Amino acid sequence: MRDDRALNVTSEIGRLKTVLLHRPGEEIENLTPDLLDRLLFDDIPYLKVAREEHDAFAQTLREAGVEVLYLEVLAAEAIETSDEVKQQFISEFIDEAGVESERLKEALIEYFNSFSDNKAMVDKMMAGVRKEELKDYHRESLYDQVNNVYPFVCDPMPNLYFTRDPFATIGHGITLNHMRTDTRNRETIFAKYIFRHHPRFEGKDIPFWFNRNDKTSLEGGDELILSKEILAVGISQRTDSASVEKLAKKLLYYPDTSFKTVLAFKIPVSRAFMHLDTVFTQVDYDKFTVHPGIVGPLEVYALTKDPENDGQLLVTEEVDTLENILKKYLDRDIKLIKCGGGDEIIAAREQWNDGSNTLAIAPGEVVVYSRNYVTNEILEKEGIKLHVIPSSELSRGRGGPRCMSMPLIREDL
């Protein structure tokens, strides 16, 4: 790893040095039962306790020597670089919020510019803006009157504490993702401005392996770095096969890349298998925690550079068990640790609460949710060091420690 690189992630388990989180905010308080489907939530977390749990997560990482950065802070700092950048950010945010009324757009621009502190403005954008919060808002136009019942001008963004999905660090670059749903695709604007304008990243020659303007979808929960040469990507409920090809072309043909193969895993299209990392994460050099439903046989496609056609890919289909695929490409014996010990009922329960979604902070050392006690006991018996965090409220969003974190720098193995 070069010391001057702002980003460096070449594995899932290298010692974690810097991570990006989002502390749950008022967007959680703006969830109501009627909005759950629209905002992709199954339940309403209790914000006070969710914050306490998230703070415990962040403190666990700090005590392990990890630098913890926050999405909301970096976004606010990024737009402080110039008023032109700030106004562009505000305008783009409003457009992507789906605001069609010109009067509402003007009112929102005035409202956001009324904040003297950029951090408070960003927090408000994330939390959502109610119509009643806009100064002198009157329902005079046809648009305003027809849409009078819905309370928000800009929807809240409760999924933001899952920082894994809007972008993903791969090597010394990122995929700035196009999310499957409009609700979540709005989240990627923060990463766009952070990596283009924040002093920490501006001018650092960060390659973008994928861009949020692409029309096909890619989400960070489907991107797992198996080694400095192999990237695994799930073809899932949230990630398209076309996106995997676009990513592979840019990554494999980049002049300074170490990656040689992209493995595309076709996984079931269902809520329980939403992303690859909900059913499969690495915990040590040779150990992975998995949902029993993904052990295979699986359809896996190996994407490599085509030696006879520059700029093109060779795609090779393989049908085999997960263990055999990993053994072949990592060139070592593999131990799969089944969520819930393989028990059908326990596995389903703990999988629902992300028992297979762990965050490695070093080889053989991971962060896990307390509620998945059966899987946790099995991990400990396999020699894995656990950092157990409280999880009664955070888990209501259906994401675990890996979902809630985006590594920016890991030590190379």
Curated annotation (Swiss-Prot):
GO terms for biological process: arginine catabolic process to ornithine; arginine deiminase pathway. InterPro entries: Arg_deiminase. The active site is at C403 (amidino-cysteine intermediate). It is found in: Cytoplasm. It holds the Pfam family ADI. Keywords: Arginine metabolism, Cytoplasm, Hydrolase. It is an enzyme of class 3 (hydrolase). GO terms for molecular function: arginine deiminase activity. GO terms for cellular component: cytoplasm. Pathway: Amino-acid degradation; L-arginine degradation via ADI pathway; carbamoyl phosphate from L-arginine: step 1/2. It catalyses: L-arginine + H2O = L-citrulline + NH4(+). SUPFAM superfamilies: Pentein (SSF55909). Its EC number is 3.5.3.6. NCBIfam families: arcA (TIGR01078), PRK01388.1 (NF002381). Belongs to the arginine deiminase family. HAMAP family: Arg_deiminase (MF_00242). This is Arginine deiminase. The lineage of its organism: Bacteria, Bacillati, Bacillota, Clostridia, Eubacteriales.
